[in-house]
Amino acid sequence: MNSKKITLANNIYLILAGLFITSLVASNLIFTKIFYWYPFDINLLGVKLFELSVGILPYPLTFLITDLISEIYGRKKADQVVITGIFASIFSIILIFVSSQVPAIDASPIDDETFNSVFLNAPLAVLASMLTYLFAQFIDIRIYHFWKKLTKGKHLWLRNNFSTFTSQFVDTFTIVSLLILFGILPEDKFLVLVISGFLFKVIVALFDTPFLYLFVWIFRKKFNLKVGEEIKLS
């Protein structure tokens, strides 16, 4: 691969990393808002099935990005993006905390109480979300490469979905458990929240599989990659 293509591959990697980090940080900032998504009118234990945090919306994109990076750039580069995303999340929390300590003036359109209620609501939840997410992403990457090696780079849909389904279940189950343990969510909502969150992520994962195929095809054509071949960046 010539230097021009290596530069292009590196630039695309940085863009994907930027999208990943932005999605991760945003999900940790917006998770307190709850929305409803009712493709099916289903009640479980008296609760509508798809009542979800808006923080769940960017998550499927992050798993699509790490799967794409895993496929094209390899496991090491995927791990680097995940670790960088965690540091970015921690840094964003530090910035928010520092901002909360600066008193708002009377003319400020946002007073201290409003600012703190939005950005400092349940810091334990943010911490739990980040730690759980880190765990789930590393599971996703390792399962993805296990299937990639086992199938010799074939059956992209298999490793994409198997890795995502497993890691998303771990993520959903663990975060809901921790939020209930911290007293942030009621215990009687455990089953509904786990099922709703996991099913939503599964549905989105199934829909993103064609996009993964498309992006992988574009990469292979642009960089003349064989099935299972990865771009090696320094």
What are the roles of these predicted feature ranges?
Residues N2-G18:
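N-terminal membrane topogenic signal
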Residues I21-W37:
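Alpha-helical transmembrane segments of multi-pass membrane proteins
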Residues L57-L68:
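Central hydrophobic cores of alpha-helical transmembrane segments in multi-pass inner-membrane proteins
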Residues S89-S108, S129, Y133, Q137:
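Transmembrane alpha-helix/helix-exit interface in multi-pass inner-membrane proteins
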Residues V98-L124:
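Membrane-interface interhelical connector segments
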Residues I218-S234:
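Short, highly charged, low-complexity non-transmembrane loops/tails of multi-pass membrane proteins
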